[in-house]
Amino acid sequence: MPRRRVAAKREILDDPKYGSQILAKFMNHVMESGKKAVAERIVYGALEKVKERKNSDPLEIFEKALDAIAPLVEVKSRRVGGATYQVPVEVRPSRRNALAMRWLVDFARKRGEKSMALRLAGELLDAAEGKGAAVKKREDVHRMAEANKAFSHYRF
């Protein structure tokens, strides 16, 4: 923890095409080595593919996918005496979104499609339908929290 003042949150401008702040934040997660234009091309390309396949608002599907991936609880390690316990804690809303975006991008990168836009579109569609690797990750995290419910009295 820093001993100085806490750094102010930077304001993230809405993305130019859809006017969505959450989509702009997602582009920052997709971006590598500061290449924002490449990240925009990937995300907009993925949303176009989603629109082609589903014939509905791609932003709606994106938000539905994020909700399906975002975890409600997670486990944190807490050392008590000589033992380390996995203590389940509730995830605050900003971290929920950050984790969902991170998992979505990570599992999209591991898919087999040809381009990143296609991988991202595939993972978005799978997540919106409640399947896919990112949704499985959320279920695993929830299962870990459920299994360690006995240690929930070791609150942070």
Swiss-Prot record:
Pfam families: Ribosomal_S7
Top-rank taxon: Bacteria
Tagged with keyword S-adenosyl-L-methionine: no
SUPFAM superfamilies: Ribosomal protein S7
Keywords: Ribonucleoprotein, Ribosomal protein, RNA-binding, rRNA-binding, tRNA-binding
Record carries keyword S-adenosyl-L-methionine: no
Gene3D superfamilies referenced in this protein's UniProt entry, alphabetically: Ribosomal protein S7 domain (1.10.455.10)
Matches recorded under InterPro entries: Ribosomal_uS7, Ribosomal_uS7_bac/org-type, Ribosomal_uS7_CS, Ribosomal_uS7_dom, Ribosomal_uS7_dom_sf
GO terms assigned for molecular function: rRNA binding; structural constituent of ribosome; tRNA binding
GO BP annotations, alphabetical order: translation
CDD domains: uS7_Bacteria
GO cellular component: small ribosomal subunit
UniProt subunit comment: Part of the 30S ribosomal subunit. Contacts proteins S9 and S11.
Family of this protein: Belongs to the universal ribosomal protein uS7 family.
Function: One of the primary rRNA binding proteins, it binds directly to 16S rRNA where it nucleates assembly of the head domain of the 30S subunit. Is located at the subunit interface close to the decoding center, probably blocks exit of the E-site tRNA.
UniProt protein name: Small ribosomal subunit protein uS7
Organism whose genome encodes this protein: Pseudomonas fluorescens (strain ATCC BAA-477 / NRRL B-23932 / Pf-5)
Lineage per the UniProt record: Bacteria, Pseudomonadati, Pseudomonadota, Gammaproteobacteria, Pseudomonadales
